[in-house]
């Protein structure tokens, strides 16, 4: 298998800032070029107060902080920046409408080839702010036009991210991963919320025609394992196991195609 370029987005479990599983997956796939845009503490949904989105548009990578700028949509924007020729305005077109990031925020760097594989594993942190309690509003947002996606829920944010990436990288194989199970007293990471997030991710993958990796059940990192192997962030043994699992899921899917 020849994967020239691998790109991943996500939270601390994927990010090189913490666990680095995204980069481990890339190495198992023998990717020649890797961009790991994931960040610790990142959420899938933009931060919001009620219906008002309070996430700033930025191309600056946050340093593992629980802040409003640390979200999937800004990771997507950083990927677009890397894909845009150096010095050019960052632009993309969806449904015949052109979007652009103002030059004062940032311009293209041209540091990334078009990815063959895009892997997104994010949702564990959704709900860590009271106003951002995770909910399944897929039915309410799944038919909205791209321009109407507010990114103030997981479904809206994932739909926006996938459709943006499909527009810019139409030939890339995109994989969305469901969250790992955890062992923690934090309510937003309990089993019921994990299952809710899993359902949203599966629905978005089906709607957009991308692939879904069911890490929640398929990785083997269940609640009983998490209890003694890192609770939220897998220990060294389980980082290897999870990276192996994800890489095999990607490989088997690509072989079928």
Give a label for each model feature:
Residues 51-52, 179-257:
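Catalytic His-Asp segment of secreted/periplasmic serine-dependent ester chemistry enzymes
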Residues 5-8, 13-136, 143, 233:
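Conserved SGNH/GDSL esterase-like catalytic core that processes O-acyl groups on lipids
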Residues 143-152, 230-233:
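The substrate-binding groove and active-site-proximal loops of carbohydrate-active enzymes
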Residues 33-35, 173, 209-212:
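Conserved beta-strand segments of alpha/beta enzyme cores
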Residues 21, 75, 154-161, 197-201, ...:
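A general structural detector for well-ordered alpha-helical segments in enzyme core domains, enriched
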Residues 121-128, 134, 159-196:
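Active-site segments of SGNH/GDSL-like serine hydrolases
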Residues 82, 160-168, 245, 249:
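A generic secondary-structure signal
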